[in-house]
């Protein structure tokens, strides 16, 4: 028997079936950077509308975790998809390089500044350490396939950037937003420095929970206010509740709410003042069975009544404050202006001075009675003993509650009033302006707007000064006596900025004030503080975006970070940009959630659920990591596990297999010579291209709306359903068995070529390495760009002509018919009636609505159903039972005739040609004749 294998057009491609990404990706990366891919993308986009995504700088310390990978990959997907959508997308990655975490690391390496080494040497060690960390993180970001100007990133420690940060401080001063004051700030005892809101984490802590008596100076005065003269018996006290006994030495008042009702209550053998709504709660907490209400009064009537401090020899007033609620406690609030924001504000209204009892190290100063030299948390028990001694302790318990901790040391922090520099939220209407600007920004997801709006509405003034060594200095001079800024501050700041531009921040520390101030140097001194690192990163809209030539003076389109940055970078950037430019620094803000395991738990070493990004790309490849990120709805928590990554691998294989099938069947196709005009193409091929156009429109829209999981879902629908289980299955017979240069085959290859050109661009933003690999295997074109990343989405797709009878509705109906036929064929296979579908003869009983659709294809219906023979008959009650598709019934029999060894179809004409006695007439026509003619499929 003749071997007809060499008469078939078998698929062939060098594109491997296995991705082997972990091995291949590094070689591709080398090629990208050897050939300056990023610059090629920039050159190809020259003159197009700019889209600027400003990179929020990660901290230059430690190895990258999955959260970093999610963030950078999302940014990269956006930048690559925006390029494909026709934008110029310069991307300048950056790093945050100053601040405490680096100081602590360097202290561990070289010791504290001014101990083993000088402050100048310490700063240089910090700079060297940060640089080393940047290089390590940079290599990992590049390995993820993230494109950007990695040779010229921005670092907040670059001399030019440090200078611009100082200039931004100058604008803040110029616009009247900076002031110095003693206010309570978050204070870390281990850092010996104030902390920003974003540097505070809340963890559970066990604290004493105490009810404390403040005895009335004049019981008669209180009785009169409550209209209870002579009522009740025993001592009369105001009762407060607190979980911070150590703040009681600093108590200077008791706050009540003017609008709340209070009652004088007989509790056993004493009388106490409580908010009416909390009497029952306190009674239960104290375990007292019977009480008596002696009188009532509004909080406003109790103003300025005095009560004795529980263990010091002075009295404190009762004052009014809106912050007092009945959410807990007693409705009377212990007020220590040094140690609480509300306490400070309300005390200021009454002219109450701060106590100033706690030093920088968290210990009570030497003049503090009873507690001198004791640490605040150590003093808790001592205060309790003192309260017991004076009879002021009404009740003591221990409770577990949420308490602020230092993000770095994981230790409890305190509120402490210290002299600091602040950006005032009310000065020059900064809060009002910022709230207005929030409304002009597109927040993705939309709930981000309400979140940051609430934070801005309620945030205190921003303490921007820090008592650190490694940071941008607050390069100001203040008067020795008045503490006022030098009148030429703005001019001096610019002079210092120019020096910093040349020599870095050390120029300030080395500066002799006399160089700039002359004789005035005797009456002015340098401010010793550094700027909050959130000021560094928050001012990058000015120090980076406004300075880099590739941004061309354009404002930023998007900030994209984790949802914790509403109170971090988004907030600091909004505050500074509004303070200096009267506008938000961004047009859109996109946030993503945090990574958790498949059970929704945080990643932690103790749970053993930590997945390191490098593990993923070393085992699976970076494209799998990228596909996992794109497949997830990033607006909520982002689940990851080895099982989930394996699932991403399955999705990847489906896409890769589709691409491989396309490439293999483009074997021998030259677009310059073999392309078929749309109107000459076979109907099914035209439909396949129109499917690709519809998919592309949806994919472009999803990319434009940053809905990458929708992109992946649409890709899978296209690859698996529209192509894999329908079109690509049907065309195999035509591809392999018709004449190599026939219209039937070239029409199909034309469709596959258009689809390949589109598909490779669809996946490029997500599966960057795989897209680059596919690009190299596509049929050669004289004008083909070297890299897919310089290209826009494919513009060669076309829809069905309006005059085309076999429109999308028609083919969608055929899809349903084919699915039903496949179901019945599967049943016949299970019943051992047939093996492969080509062993079947199918009779389709169709309703009057469906039958004309099937008959339109004539003899080509069998190619769509992938059976050897098909008969279409009218549906009647006498026929076999209707199928799951209304208006259709299917009957399966074994096909007539013999199996053709060339096309595998069963035919009754095998042996009718003596020269080719083993193959069917159709194959003889394709081997010897002019080739079979196809019109529809």
Curated annotation (Swiss-Prot):
Zn(2+) binds at residues 900, 903, 920, 923. It comes from the Bacteria. Coiled coil: none annotated. ATP binds at residue 605. It is found in: Cytoplasm. The keyword Lipoprotein does not apply. Its EC number is 6.1.1.5. Gene3D superfamilies: 1.10.730.20, HUPs. Keywords: Aminoacyl-tRNA synthetase, ATP-binding, Cytoplasm, Ligase, Metal-binding, Nucleotide-binding, Protein biosynthesis, Zinc. L-isoleucyl-5'-AMP binds at residue 561. Monomer. IleRS has two distinct active sites: one for aminoacylation and one for editing. The misactivated valine is translocated from the active site to the editing site, which sterically excludes the correctly activated isoleucine. The single editing site contains two valyl binding pockets, one specific for each substrate (Val-AMP or Val-tRNA(Ile)). HAMAP family: Ile_tRNA_synth_type1. Belongs to the class-I aminoacyl-tRNA synthetase family. IleS type 1 subfamily. PANTHER family: ISOLEUCINE--TRNA LIGASE, MITOCHONDRIAL (PTHR42765:SF1), SOLEUCYL-TRNA SYNTHETASE (PTHR42765). This is Isoleucine--tRNA ligase. It comes from Histophilus somni (strain 129Pt). The gene is ileS.
């Amino acid at each position: 028997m003749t071997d007809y294998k060499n008469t078939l057009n078998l698929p062939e491609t060098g594109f491997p079936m296995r991705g082997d990404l972990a091995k291949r990706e590094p070689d591709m990366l080398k090629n990208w950077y050897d050939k300056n891919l990023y610059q090629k993308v920039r050159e190809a986009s020259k003159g197009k509308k700019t889209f600027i995504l400003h990179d929020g700088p990660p901290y230059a310390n430690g190895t990258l975790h999955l959260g970093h990978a999610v963030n950078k990959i999302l940014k990269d997907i956006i930048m690559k998809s925006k390029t494909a959508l026709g934008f110029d997308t310069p991307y300048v990655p950056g790093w945050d390089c100053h601040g405490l975490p680096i100081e602590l690391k360097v202290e561990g390496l070289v010791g504290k500044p001014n101990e083993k080494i000088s402050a100048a040497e310490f700063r240089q060690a910090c700079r060297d350490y940060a640089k080393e960390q940047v290089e390590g993180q940079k290599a990992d970001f590049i390995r993820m396939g993230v494109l950007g100007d990695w040779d010229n990133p921005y670092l907040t420690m670059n001399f030019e950037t440090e200078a611009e940060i100082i200039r931004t401080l100058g604008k803040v001063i110029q616009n009247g937003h900076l002031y110095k004051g003693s206010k309570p700030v978050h204070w870390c005892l281990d850092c010996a420095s104030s902390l920003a809101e974003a540097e505070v984490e809340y963890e559970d802590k066990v604290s004493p929970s105490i009810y404390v008596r403040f005895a009335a100076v004049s019981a008669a005065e209180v009785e009169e206010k409550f209209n209870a003269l002579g009522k009740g018996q025993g001592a009369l006290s105001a009762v407060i509740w607190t979980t911070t006994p150590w703040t009681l030495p600093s108590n200077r008042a008791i706050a009540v709410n003017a609008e709340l009702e209070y009652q004088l209550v007989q509790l056993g053998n004493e009388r106490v003042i409580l908010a009416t709504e909390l009497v029952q709660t306190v009674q239960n907490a104290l375990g007292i069975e019977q009480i008596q209400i002696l009188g009532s009064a509004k909080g406003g009537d109790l103003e300025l009544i005095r009560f004795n401090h529980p263990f010091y020899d002075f009295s404190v007033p009762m004052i009014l404050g809106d912050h007092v609620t009945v959410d807990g406690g007693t409705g009377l609030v212990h007020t220590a202006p040094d140690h609480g924001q509300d306490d400070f504000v309300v005390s200021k209204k009454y002219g109450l001075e701060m106590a100033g009892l706690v030093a920088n190290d968290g210990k009570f100063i030497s003049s503090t009675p009873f507690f001198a030299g004791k640490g605040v948390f150590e003093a808790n028990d001592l205060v309790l003993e003192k309260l017991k001694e004076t009879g002021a302790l009404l009740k003591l318990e221990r409770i577990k509650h949420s308490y602020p901790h230092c993000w770095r040391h994981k230790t409890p922090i305190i509120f402490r009033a210290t002299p600091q520099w602040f950006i005032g939220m009310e000065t020059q209407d900064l809060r009002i302006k910022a709230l207005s600007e929030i409304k002009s920004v597109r927040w993705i997801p939309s709930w981000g707007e309400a979140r940051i709006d609430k934070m801005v509405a309620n945030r205190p003034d921003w303490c921007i000064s820090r008592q650190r060594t490694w940071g941008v200095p607050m390069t100001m001079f203040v008067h020795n006596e008045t503490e006022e800024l030098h009148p030429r501050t703005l001019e001096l700041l610019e002079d210092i900025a120019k020096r910093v531009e040349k020599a870095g921040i050390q120029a300030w520390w080395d500066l002799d004030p006399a160089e700039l101030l002359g004789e005035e140097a005797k009456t002015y001194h340098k401010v010793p503080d550094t700027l909050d690192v959130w000021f560094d990163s928050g001012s990058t809209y000015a120090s980076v975006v406004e300075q880099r030539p590739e941004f061309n003076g354009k404002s930023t389109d998007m900030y994209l970070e984790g949802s914790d940055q509403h109170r971090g970078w988004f907030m600091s950037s909004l505050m500074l940009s509004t303070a200096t430019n009267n506008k938000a620094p961004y047009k859109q803000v996109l946030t993503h959630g945090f990574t958790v395991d498949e059970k929704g738990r945080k990643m932690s070493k103790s749970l053993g659920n930590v997945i390191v990004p490098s593990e993923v790309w070393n085992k699976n490849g970076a494209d799998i990591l990228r596909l996992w990120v794109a497949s997830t709805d990033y607006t909520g928590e982002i689940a990851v596990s080895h099982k989930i990554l394996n699932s991403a691998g399955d999705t990847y294989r489906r896409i890769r297999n589709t691409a491989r099938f396309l490439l293999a069947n483009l074997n021998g196709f030259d677009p310059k010579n073999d392309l078929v005009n749309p109107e000459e193409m076979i109907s099914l091929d035209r439909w396949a291209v129109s499917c690709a156009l519809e998919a592309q429109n949806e994919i472009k829209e999803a990319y434009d709306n940053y809905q990458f999981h929708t992109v992946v879902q649409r890709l899978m629908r296209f690859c698996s359903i529209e192509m894999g289980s329908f079109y690509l299955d049907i065309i195999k017979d035509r591809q392999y068995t018709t004449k190599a240069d026939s219209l039937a085959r070239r029409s199909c290859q034309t469709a596959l070529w258009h689809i390949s050109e589109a598909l490779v661009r669809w996946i490029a933003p997500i599966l960057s390495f795989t897209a680059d690999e596919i690009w190299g295997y596509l049929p050669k074109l004289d004008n083909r760009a070297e890299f897919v990343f310089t290209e826009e989405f494919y513009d060669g797709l076309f829809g069905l002509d309006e005059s085309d009878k076999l429109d999308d509705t028609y083919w969608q109906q055929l899809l349903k018919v084919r699915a039903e036929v496949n179901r019945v064929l599967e049943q016949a296979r299970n019943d051992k009636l047939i093996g492969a579908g080509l062993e079947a003869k199918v009779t389709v009983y169709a309703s009057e609505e469906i039958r004309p659709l099937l008959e339109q294809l004539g003899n080509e219906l069998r190619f769509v159903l992938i059976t050897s023979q098909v008969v279409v008959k009218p549906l009647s009650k006498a026929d076999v039972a209707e199928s799951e598709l209304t208006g259709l019934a299917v009957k399966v029999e074994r096909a007539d005739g013999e199996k053709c060894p060339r096309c595998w179809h069963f035919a009754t004409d095998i042996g009718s040609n003596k020269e080719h006695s083993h193959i069917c007439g159709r194959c003889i026509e394709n081997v010897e004749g002019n080739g079979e003619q196809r019109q529809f499929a």
